[in-house]
């Protein structure tokens, strides 16, 4: 009999979900949600600004509290789950990582663009030095082929990553692509493979199931799918689907549904797949760009879909949110000249 692998659930409601909240969760709200996630048996709970440690800024949006305040609010309520923090080299620093460890972080998820794994070496080295688990996060993985993803994942493995995630930042992938790329990573890596999905094409749960079938053993979700654009993989739906498919999941289905109920009154809007979200997935644009694009479209009198398609053509990457205004301004001027 073939052993069914146990799937590790990492919930990022309190980090990736921050994008849909304009980064305005309070520390008290985070503690409430984290306690419910912990009670449900979630393995890892990620907490920071949506753009990771030190992301609170004019460029990315100011959070309601500091990373330290958020982490210190959540750490005491966790009885079983590990506390995680995201860091993007170039935004967060080694000093921020030291603060996070003092605040109770046990897992660092270190994210780079899929072609820039080399900039994670210092941060991964420090995380290992401090005794933390290291998760490599290769963002915008839809933009390159499986060989390039594998090359970059091997770099992260060499830096000490304990697991490497393929990240569909734009919700642009379809199941056959996920199957091919995850399967290839599984072949070439000597460490576990993970997958993080977005729901812009309505495929987050389906893509995650495809990833697991291809060998991924660590997967992400957010309660109610909370996140930028059409959101993320819904943790509670994913748990139900994985259990129905026969995988071992250490999360209690009823309790994770209860956790989603705790979150729901805090949400600013339901997670729906609207037209702009579809364009995000179709154009392959990073999901956190959506709210910034709406603002730029209103400011310059443009259709946000046109801005998103242009950003996709220019292959923008995470961290270039300030570029949206430049693109919108240029498009507005070109539109004026054409009149």
UniProtKB/Swiss-Prot annotation:
InterPro entries: 2-IPM_HCS-like, 4OH_2_O-val_aldolase, Aldolase_TIM, DmpG_comm, DRE_TIM_HOA, PYR_CT. The keyword Metal-binding applies. The active site is at 19 (proton acceptor). CDD domains: DRE_TIM_HOA (cd07943). The record marks 15 as: Transition state stabilizer. Residues 7-257 form the Pyruvate carboxyltransferase domain. SUPFAM superfamilies: Aldolase, post-HMGL domain-like. One of its GO terms (molecular function) is 2-isopropylmalate synthase activity. The keyword NADP does not apply. GO terms for biological process: catabolic process; L-leucine biosynthetic process. Its EC number is 4.1.3.39. It catalyses: (S)-4-hydroxy-2-oxopentanoate = acetaldehyde + pyruvate. Substrate binds at residues 15-16, 169, 196, 286. Keywords: Aromatic hydrocarbons catabolism, Lyase, Manganese, Metal-binding. Mn(2+) binds at residues 16, 196, 198. It is an enzyme of class 4 (lyase). Belongs to the 4-hydroxy-2-oxovalerate aldolase family. This is 4-hydroxy-2-oxovalerate aldolase. The lineage of its organism: Bacteria, Bacillati, Bacillota, Clostridia, Eubacteriales.
């Amino acid at each position: 009999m073939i052993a069914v692998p146990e799937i590790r659930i990492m919930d990022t409601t309190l980090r990736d979900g921050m994008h849909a909240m304009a980064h305005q969760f309070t520390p008290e709200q985070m503690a409430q949600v984290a306690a419910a996630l912990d009670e449900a048996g979630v393995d890892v709970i990620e907490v920071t600004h949506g753009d990771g440690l030190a992301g609170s800024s004019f460029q990315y949006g100011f959070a309601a509290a500091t990373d330290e305040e958020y982490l210190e609010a959540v750490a005491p309520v966790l009885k079983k789950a590990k506390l995680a923090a995201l860091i993007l080299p170039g935004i967060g620093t080694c000093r921020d990582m030291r603060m996070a460890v003092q605040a109770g972080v046990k897992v660092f998820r270190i994210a780079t663009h899929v072609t820039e794994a080399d900039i994670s070496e210092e941060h991964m080295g420090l995380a290992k030095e401090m005794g933390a688990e290291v998760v490599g996060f290769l963002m915008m993985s839809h933009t390159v082929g499986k060989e390039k993803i594998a090359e970059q994942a091997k770099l992260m493995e060499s830096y000490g990553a304990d697991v490497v995630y393929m990240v569909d930042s734009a919700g642009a992938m379809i199941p056959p692509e996920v199957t091919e790329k995850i399967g290839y990573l599984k072949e070439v890596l000597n460490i576990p493979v993970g997958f993080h999905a977005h729901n812009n094409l309505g495929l987050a749960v389906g893509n995650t199931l495809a990833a697991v079938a291809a060998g991924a053993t660590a997967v992400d979700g957010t309660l109610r799918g909370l996140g930028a654009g059409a959101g993320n993989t819904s943790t509670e739906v994913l748990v139900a689907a994985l259990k129905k498919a026969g995988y071992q999941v250490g999360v209690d289905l009823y309790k994770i549904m209860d956790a989603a109920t705790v979150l729901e009154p805090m949400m600013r809007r339901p997670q729906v797949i609207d037209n702009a979200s579809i364009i995000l997935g179709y154009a392959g644009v990073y999901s956190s760009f959506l709210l910034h694009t709406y603002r730029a479209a209103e400011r310059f009198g443009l259709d946000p879909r046109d801005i998103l398609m242009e950003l996709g053509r220019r292959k923008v990457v995470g961290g270039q949110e300030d570029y949206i205004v430049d693109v919108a301004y240029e498009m507005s001027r070109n539109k004026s000249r054409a009149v």
